[in-house]
UniProtKB/Swiss-Prot annotation:
Name of protein: Outer membrane protein assembly factor BamC
Record keywords: Cell outer membrane, Lipoprotein, Membrane, Palmitate, Signal
HAMAP family attached to this UniProt entry: OM_assembly_BamC
Subunit structure comment from the entry: Part of the Bam complex, which is composed of the outer membrane protein BamA, and four lipoproteins BamB, BamC, BamD and BamE.
Membrane topology: Lipid-anchor
Organism: Rahnella sp. (strain Y9602)
Domain of life: Bacteria
Amino acid sequence: MASLFDKNSFQMTRLQKTAVAKVVGVSLIMLLAACSSDQRYKRQVSGDEAYLDASGLHELKAPVGMILPVQNGTYEVQAGSMQGAVGKQLDIRPPSQPLALLSGSQTQFSGNSSTVLLENTAQNRDLWNNVVKAVEQNNFKIANRDDANQTLTTDFVDWNRADEDFQYQGRYQISVKQQSYQLALTVKTLELKQQDKPVTSSAEIQRYNSQMMNAITANLDKVQQDTQARLDNRRVGEIDVQSGADDTGLPVLIVRESYGVVWDRLPNALTKVGMKVTDSSRPQGTLSVTYKPLNDDAWQTLGAKDPGLTSGDYKLQVGDLDNRSSLQFLDPKGHALSQSQNDAMVAVMQAAFSQSNAK
């Protein structure tokens, strides 16, 4: 009987411990879940708060018979009352501000509006259209749009910040106006609320107004970078090649690009036309190449006709003409190309440069 009782007692004890462990585990999970949803720690100062319990200032009382120094206002601690949040209620996040992300831009914030001032240049000619695209690409719903006056009003934008317990919603007026020689992109907060209650805190209005402005200008900055990249790529492809002559009257190719750019792009361009660089000297401007004519399909792909050069080893002299460069091909016998061959190489090198980048 004793043995059976001990066994039952052991099983009951084990069941009780298991139940307790489960309860503790569930409680711990609930506690962690509660902590993970409380974002106040991201806004609160950490450390000792004993200063909040410090006693206030009081008049200094000297013992009888002691003569105090003459009072000097320089060292006097002024008594005053402080208004605003303290301790854990104090929001330590720095104020948000509109960022000057765009080239040549200036930013400012006043009241409930942020403004980005831009140069009224060709680069910003389509500013309004790009602003509308930026709003749409950020999935900000447009409630009203007036292209004639370059003004739009958003519907409520649902902000989602990890440092907020309850998210904010805001409505904004976005406009582009000309101010003297500048363009002014302005974002005005029309309404800000949290849990369906109006928010009047200037810090919060500035925070979410700046967030809207920065979302727009970040998109505009990307548009500017993409546009500049396309222009750069276009310039890379659009090297103009013409036929010319040197001081002695021998035919050369004139490339309307600087020596450095031409030199950097020549190896790839020459490869496109069947010329393999075997040796080169940048200081002397010389290259040695071995030429093997392309087949008909390759010439068609390049977009140029066979210039009629024979196979063999050629020399290429590159000349620096300030903002232009010269190219002179010497055949395997050391002779300059004929005028007809040189003229044929104009289209060949024009096509080769357009399809090649720097090495």
